[in-house]
Amino acid sequence: MNFILLSASDAHKIVIQKLMQYYIYDFSEYIKYDVGDNGLFEPYPNLMDYWERDNNQFPYVIKMNDKYIGFVLVKLINSIERNYFSIAEFFILKKYRREGIGKAIAVKVFNLHKGHWEVYQINSNIPAQIFWNKVISEYTKGQFEERLEDGKKIQNFEN
């Protein structure tokens, strides 16, 4: 696996915008999105906010052999109970899945952001639930909690 996880610069905005169309297409299986009259899905809300300074949002692009293969959007959520990191979106093009890249990227992202984490998946996205449960279980050596809340499965842990 010869992949690179890069902090997404301004130059990567358009790359993530375009990859987001594939992500939304994949996700439309679980939440019924439709394309507009222009043949595209609606733009991801507030995507450009990830490049605002000091906003606790961290966009990443994933490259393999000099080709873009995905992205990760991480947020630091400031909560009354505690601050925590969350993976807002995680996407790898289908042809690169099931090769261990997703797990390796997730581990790299977790290691970049130390603290409390909450990773959630919608109830209907069973493949994502299986993926995240396995990755987080291995990463934490089983030291994580899982709960159902507001139609989502949530894993939380400290690293």
Residue spans of the language-model regions?
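Conserved beta-strand-loop-alpha-helix junction that forms the acyl-donor binding cleft
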Residues: 118-133, 137, 147-150, 158
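Conserved beta-strand in the GNAT
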Residues: 59-61, 67-76, 86
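Conserved acetyl-CoA binding element of GNAT-fold acetyltransferases
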Residues: 82-94, 120
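Conserved acetyl-CoA-binding loop-helix of GNAT-fold acetyltransferases
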Residues: 92, 98-111
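Conserved N-terminal entry element of GNAT/NAT acetyltransferase domains
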Residues: 1-31
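A short helix-loop-beta-strand connector motif used in the catalytic cores of GNAT acetyltransferases and
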Residues: 45-61
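Conserved GNAT-fold acetyl-CoA-binding loop/helix
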Residues: 24-48
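Glycine-rich ATP-binding loops of the HATPase_c
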Residues: 142-144
